[in-house]
Regions:
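Conserved ATP-binding subdomain of kinase catalytic cores across diverse folds
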Residues: 1-60, 65-160, 213-342
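Sequence-structural signature of the catalytic-core scaffold of metal-dependent phosphohydrolases
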Residues: 135-205
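Bergerat-fold GHKL/Histidine-kinase-like ATPase
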Residues: 179-227, 235-240
Length: 342
């Protein structure tokens, strides 16, 4: 059956490439968000003062305002953390600060805010970075700050209110749940669907899904539906799948929506001496566990279609809609898988 607004597999790449270019041309801020590689090329060729060398540590690598937001842990806690770590490496933290500062400046410019407002935004960014090194924050639980701004508290409340039911209403159809094909979700090739079934037959994926639904490790798991997921900006064109799985059986059966995303080599400069996983999916998961533990604990590295890295995530990077906050509370059934091209 042909679905309205859907795209067949053989037409994907042409449309995705066009859409990526269109999104990046929409505004200066959108261009900054979607041009990670060019950002680092610009830094390399800039004749300005040398970038200070910070301690070698895990960095986001693509730290812009769109990659920060509420993230939930498996037990329901919420915190503002990094939500996309495709570019994460062990590198220089100054790169994250410069990229985030540029993103904030472009967002302010696109909103016609005065220069003094932009300066204040950048000052607050540096203040926040410095505050993280104070003894008072060393043992502070994520998201537990009493000094959280009113706007951030509102964002956190909205995120906490978005349940699996809301997400299911947006993405799943019918009594026998399916992923609705259309503008956002597209049909898979036969070999892609077969690869998904094989992927979710693996024990590691079973444990990830059952843990999110508070089920035993040996609880039955079956793939109910899967589709290509049209999502992102600079990542458009990479393999990304939405997979709906059922965990358990009978009245105890619950559903999980899994995000399977291809991982590729990072453009962010990495430390020449630090040891980190060579597999791109394993690198992303390791970076997520270090920088965004709420996200990292719902992610796993795997292989799909012979590609050495896909990172399945149970609500890994979250399953957000547009600019809405992602929610993946325990029992809400969100998951993810990461994979990389070797």
């Amino acid at each position: 059956m042909k679905h309205k607004n859907t795209v067949e597999p053989h037409d994907r790449m042409k449309l995705l490439n066009t859409e990526r270019n269109t999104k990046m041309a929409a505004s200066a801020h959108a261009y900054v968000r979607g041009s990670t590689a060019r950002f680092y090329e610009w830094l390399e060729t800039s004749d300005r003062a040398a970038i200070p060398e910070g301690p070698q540590a895990w960095i986001c690598g693509d730290c812009h305002v769109g990659n920060l937001g509420p993230v939930a842990s498996t037990d329901g806690a919420l915190a503002i953390q990094i939500r996309d770590l495709d570019q994460t490496v062990i590198g220089n933290p100054a790169h994250d600060l410069i990229r985030l500062g540029l993103s904030l400046a472009m967002a302010a410019r696109g909103s016609d805010l005065p220069g003094v407002t932009t300066a204040h935004m950048l000052e607050r960014m540096i203040d926040g970075y410095e505050a993280a090194f104070t003894p008072e924050t060393e043992n502070e639980a994520p998201g537990a700050s009493d000094n959280m701004p009113k706007s951030i508290r509102l964002l956190m409340r909205e995120a906490a209110g978005r349940s699996w039911k809301h997400l299911a209403d947006e993405r799943i159809e019918g009594i026998a749940p399916t992923i609705p094909l259309g503008k956002r979700f597209w049909p898979l090739r036969q070999d892609e669907r077969a690869a998904v079934d094989a992927l979710f037959a693996e024990e590691a994926l079973r444990r990830l899904a059952t843990s999110l639904r508070s089920r035993r490790d040996d609880a039955p798991l079956r793939v109910m539906d899967a589709a290509y997921w049209r999502k992102g900006c600079s990542s458009l064109g990479r393999l990304r799948l939405a997979v709906l799985v059922a965990v358990g059986s009978g009245k105890a059966e619950r559903h999980c929506l899994m995000d399977v995303k291809e991982a590729i080599a990072a453009a962010a400069p990495r430390s020449r001496t630090a040891e980190m996983p060579r597999n791109n999916a394993e690198r992303v998961v390791a970076g997520a566990c270090s920088l965004s533990p709420f996200l990292g604990q719902r992610m796993i590295a795997a292989q799909l279609l012979g590609q050495g890295g896909v990172h399945p995530r149970v609500a890994a990077a979250g399953l957000e809609t547009g600019n809405r906050a992602p929610v993946a509370r325990r029992g809400d059934g969100y998951g993810g898988v990461l994979g990389s091209r070797c």
